[in-house]
Amino acid sequence: MQVITSVKEAKQIVKDWKSHQLSIGYVPTMGFLHDGHLSLVKHAKTQDKVIVSIFVNPMQFGPNEDFSSYPRDLERDIKMCQDNGVDMVFIPDATQMYLKNFSTYVDMNTITDKLCGAKRPGHFRGVCTVLTKFFNILNPDIVYMGQKDAQQCVVVRHMVDDLNFDLKIQICPIIREEDGLAKSSRNVYLSKEERKASLAISQSIFLAEKLVREGEKNTSKIIQAMKDILEKEKLIKIDYIELVDFNTMENIENITDNVLGAVAAFVGKTRLIDNFLVQGLK
């Protein structure tokens, strides 16, 4: 496995692979890897070569968010990648990604102003900009992203279509702890009491998905049922609960098809997200 920090060197390796007609699966991460990331690596191994990038992108964090405290453990991440058959770990620093006087950004006028985008201004501008750069540097065939960041997946798919990138976005299922909590690098922030309280998030998601699959169409009723679960936990502060069309991120009143149910909530000071996706409803 190659551990690369230079943009120039990464591009040269990719160029060599492509000259031998090798396909590339790419998993973008911010590090502090967990089983959710490793499941993406497993999917990516259907390609000839697998690249994992590790970059805590300052551009996608707001001024009062957790950029400086975001968990980091490069040595552990590199070992996990090696143990799971990754071919290249690309670990650029901010000076490699954003040169002096950097002034070019990728933004989107729709989809990004809802859900997490509404709560985190500028977040998706940072995501789209950095992924555009990674796509140009690494030239992947398929990019593997987790459904836990569902809005991000939809935003990036739209960006790929709009900008004619020659690649495919593959959305992979949420990976959960044994008790149901969605795997997240930020789970490490939780105290014992907060960890216990956080289960209300996944419980609200499971209930809502069950209601949808059983035929409930009224989103107000589903949202209220989710609120009832979350509001029982004093350590939880709801950021949003939304049921939206998965393709447009627009709120829906009556469920027809492709519904995404999404929750963001603070457990203590830690903001966690979770969701369910139901497609193919008649």
Swiss-Prot record:
Species for this entry: Campylobacter jejuni subsp. jejuni serotype O:2 (strain ATCC 700819 / NCTC 11168)
**Which family, according to the similarity comment?**
Belongs to the pantothenate synthetase family.
Primary site of residence: cytoplasm
Q: What's the subunit arrangement here?
A: Homodimer.
Question: What top-level class of enzyme does the UniProt entry assign?
Answer: ligase
Q: What is this protein called?
A: Pantothenate synthetase
Q: Which residues bind beta-alanine?
A: 60
Q: Which gene encodes it?
A: panC
**This protein's GO CC annotations:** cytosol
Catalytic residues in the record: 37
What keywords sit in the KW lines?
A: ATP-binding, Cytoplasm, Ligase, Nucleotide-binding, Pantothenate biosynthesis
**Record-listed ATP binding positions:** 30-37, 146-149, 175, 183-186
- Extract the GO molecular function terms from the UniProt entry: ATP binding; pantoate-beta-alanine ligase activity
From the broadest rank down, the organism's phylogenetic lineage runs:
Bacteria, Pseudomonadati, Campylobacterota, Epsilonproteobacteria, Campylobacterales
Please give the Pfam families that the UniProt record associates with this protein: Pantoate_ligase (PF02569)
